[in-house]
Design a protein with these regions (language model features):
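N-terminal basic, low-complexity leaders that serve as flexible interaction/assembly modules and, when applicable
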Residues: 2-92, 128, 132
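Short, flexible active-site loop motifs that bind/organize anionic cofactors or intermediates
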Residues: 1-2, 45, 116, 164
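Short, intrinsically disordered, charge-balanced linker/junction segments flanking boundaries
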Residues: 1-2, 190-192
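Active-site-proximal, glycine-rich beta->alpha crossover segments in alpha/beta enzymes
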Residues: 85-191
Length: 192
């Protein structure tokens, strides 16, 4: 591929692979939902966390209005853990959602990846928003699907305090929590 043949997507992929590019891609791999853009496009939190149309609209705003060379969504690290049973405070227009209750702080009795994981919580909204974004920006714009990794998922399921204690005193529970979290993260990532 010659330098002039790069699309936004092929340029980002080449840069991530350490290959030569015509210019450094400009994108955000963390969330991009800022209050000014929410106001500009009429897609604000917390509604844009649950409504796929608003989620897509806000995500595309940074590409269209700010010139970022990728679209990134969703806007928090609680989508997967909500589907796994964590209670979530959905935040406000200028505050991201956060975990307020952990389902397994004492033991992992009953802990497992739900068979219907991809139909739980906000996961369907995120997956639908990704489809909407792809339809609107076409195949040549990178879409960055943000999500929690296994350590974040595990520590949210059991609480950071238990997770840290288990890493030293109950390594079997620590490893089990990570196994469950890894399985869930892989399923969610593959669906994105």
């Amino acid at each position: 591929m010659t330098m002039s043949e790069f699309t936004l997507k092929t340029r980002l992929l080449a840069a991530l692979e350490g290959k030569p590019v015509d210019k450094v891609p400009v994108c955000s791999v963390t969330q991009t939902g800022i209050v000014e853009l929410m106001d500009e496009v009429g897609a604000a939190w917390p509604e844009a966390h649950t409504n796929p149309e608003l989620m897509a609209k806000l995500a595309i705003a940074n590409y269209e209005l700010s010139g970022l060379e990728a679209v990134r969504l969703p806007y928090c690290l609680t989508v997967l853990v909500e589907a796994m049973g964590c209670q979530i405070n959905m935040g406000t227009k200028n505050r991201q959602p956060s975990v307020i209750e952990h389902p397994y702080p004492k033991s992992l009795d009953g802990a497992a990846v739900p068979a219907d994981l991809l139909q739980k919580g906000r996961i369907p909204a995120v997956l639908e928003a990704i489809k909407i974004v792809r339809e609107k920006v076409g195949p040549d714009v990178p879409i960055i699907g943000g999500m929690e990794g296994p350590i974040t998922v595990a520590s949210d399921l059991v609480s950071v305090k238990s997770f840290m204690k288990w890493s030293i005193k109950k390594t079997d529970l620590f490893e089990q929590a990570l196994d469950i979290a890894t399985e869930a993260a892989i399923a969610y990532a593959n669906a994105m």
